[in-house]
Amino acid sequence: MYATVQELVDALTLEEKAGLCTGAAVPRLGLPALRVNGLHSQESAGGVCFPSACAAAASFDPEAARRMGAALGREARSGGAQLLDVPDVNLKRGPLSGRSADTWAEDPCLTGALAAAFLQGVQSAGVGGCAGQLAVVNQETDRRTLNRRVDERTLQELYLPAFETAVRDGQPQAVVCSAGLLNGTRICEDTALLTDTLRGAWGFAGAVLAEPGAVQDPARTLAAGVDFAPADAGRLVDAVQSGALDESVLNRAASNIIRTLLAASTQPSPADRTADRSLAVELAKQSGVLLRNLGALPLHKGQKVAYIGAFADHPRYSAGHPRAPQVTSAIDAAVLHDRKIHYIEGFPADRDQRDEAEFLRAVAAAEAADAAVIFAGLPECAELAAADRRHMRLPECQNNLIARVAAVQKNTVVVLHTSGPVECPWADDVSSVLCMYLAGEGLGEATDALLWGDADPCGRLPETWPLRLEDTPCYLDFPGDGVTADYREGVYVGYRWYDARKMPVRWPFGHGLSYTGYVYRGAALDADTLTPGGTVTARVTVKNSGAMRGAEVVQLYVADATGAPVPGGRVPQALRRFAKIDLQPGEEREVVFTLTPQDISRYSPELHAWCAAPGRYGIRIGHSSRDIRAVLALQYADAKI
């Protein structure tokens, strides 16, 4: 009946337009209410539970993120969803955030690439993706009312680039703006952010949705650039009738909502749960990060192995209380593969409580075995999705048992289940540490495959693991005073902080060991000078020097060696490119990266522009942020791009 979006808008009454933009349907025109499905509600409804973002990020693989997004999109579509409220495109500012499970990484390059690929996957299934929450949402404490004070350079270099990449490359149907304030302005009333930057600079053409509870003044919210503002529709009607809100603004918002509704597939499509579950196991394998290995791993057939810790039987596989129907524990997987294991609970999964008899049984079993695997991690109550953590410690019952077992068993392995870094006081005393994060319902099979050498660990840390909480960038400012959170660390988040201060860490950003080895050779640039508007190509050849198939993550960092003064300080290095390559034993492959002046630039608050200082830059290629295999010199000769 109505051929275009404009014709539909013209057919709406003022009250219907206001209702559409605040959550109501328009039945007479066949327009449903806009509904956004949460990821965890999708899982709880019987869908496959895939790795959380914190685990998927460890894959360092945009293609894996795209495949996971596509599967989630198919499952959401099978339930009739219009929009899926993922991904979170914020950064991991520190280790205590209650949002850690759903946040990808501490670095904007990695976060942006994975979020964009994930969005492409979701939307390939006919379901819209929502990039959220714009912007600078790094905690749960006072999140809806907090004023984040962040300087301009830090915003432009750290917290906005991941969103820009997600918007430009992922083309989401919607962006969610957060509650709270940014530098004194309500985020959902920030015209500079929502209109000038999001729509103007980044070219976003979808719908901007206000987070529930974020709207204080619906008229000001829509005027700033929001299209969907859960509030009393009557207030919008009154604002238009009084002249406080131009009806053209309401028309724009209604148009964007209608486009979003029409873009969603109207026909539910059944999901292939069998294929999706196989994918969940595959992705969980890619999420495992081998942090330390002195030879206890991989375990070997015929070894008698003690499995200790309740997580071996009751795995911690996700946040948000999902109830996946096909979760397999590490014990189930070991039994299926006829491993010689002996299980002792040792400590409970849901609390910090030491049972002395159980403690001694675990120590005795470990001493009698050929190896001991301790399944440790944070109880679910310590990582609630709506609350920040208070410390970085594992339960004392776990730390004590790990230390005691390590004293009697040289082949002690610790498997960690957590959404982020924890302090590991026993790290130097155990043989091996495998971090599985929250790897979804495929966790049990994946852990079994990685422990016993049926798969090679290829995950890399998407965040730095510090030695202790006091070392972290925002230790003195997190979570704020209840009114304001000061981001005084500026651009020094994650590895940028530790590198600038030359601080030791437990495990660095990008770190991850393997059962095979990789040799880098022939690193070179195709030119030693980069010019404005030009490009330079970096090449390196990587060879699998071991006897097992593996996947290496080649990481490229840029270091500013110009010596030019930088207000706010110079970042020692920043990730600019990465590539994951699968290699058979003896196989080698050339990895190629193309760099532009933007990759060597920093943001100038004085000029309100990105600038590349003339001089020398270091192109650093390696296995992690602290395992650099080649450094190449690059000159740049122009000051502004």
Model-inferred region functions:
Residues 1-605, 609-626, 640-641:
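Glycoside hydrolase catalytic-domain context in secreted enzymes
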Residues 627-632:
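Extracellular and select intracellular beta-sandwich modules with Ser/Thr-enriched
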Residues 633-641:
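Short beta-strand edge segments in extracellular beta-sheet folds
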